[in-house]
Amino acid sequence: SAASDVYKRQPIRQYPEPAFWRAPIDNDFGNKMPVLAGVWRTAHANRYVKKVTIGENNEKGLSVRVDWVLSDIQVPYTMEYLVRDNGTVIVTGSIDLTGTKLPELPRFGMRMELHQPYENLTYYGRGPFENYIDRYSGAFIGRYEDKVENQFYWYIRPQETGNKTDVRWLTLLDSGGLGVKITGLQPISFSALHFSPEDLDPVSYTHLR
């Protein structure tokens, strides 16, 4: 049926949600980050909607604002969507930490999940190997193509991996050239993996640390 065909071609399994945690690296354990900042590990998961505001449809598009409260830490988080006439959606996330005494934020961004076939990665940013804000001078800006399965680096202990910095845009496509394109309003960092941060940092695997 037409409905099932549309579903099969829908690339997004889990739409963007807030992301505050990354799998700790070896240095983080020396700094006790997993313990000191552990409240951020699940802060994205326990939340409730406080208010939804739908704006007027104008020449910029249709805006939808969702005000959340992060239940575990009682902090407001806002996601705004601007749906434009050309089919693109601008997604913006913001958090208000005014007056809080929370620990250092390991990461601020969003995460989403795609269906499995979108294995072909192309991006314009620093590469071709993983790079981070504190180690990227050897990774030059360019256009890179690779498979998602190659973005994971086999460290001795599973940890944060695969990040790319100064990225202007990226695409994840299937064998037929269908998929998604993500463009930053400013240079962004991203990782595209077959693993979630939880997979790389299972709390119960203390014997690996």
Residue ranges, per PLM feature:
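Beta-strand/loop-rich accessory regions of lumenal/periplasmic or secreted enzymes
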Residues: 1-209
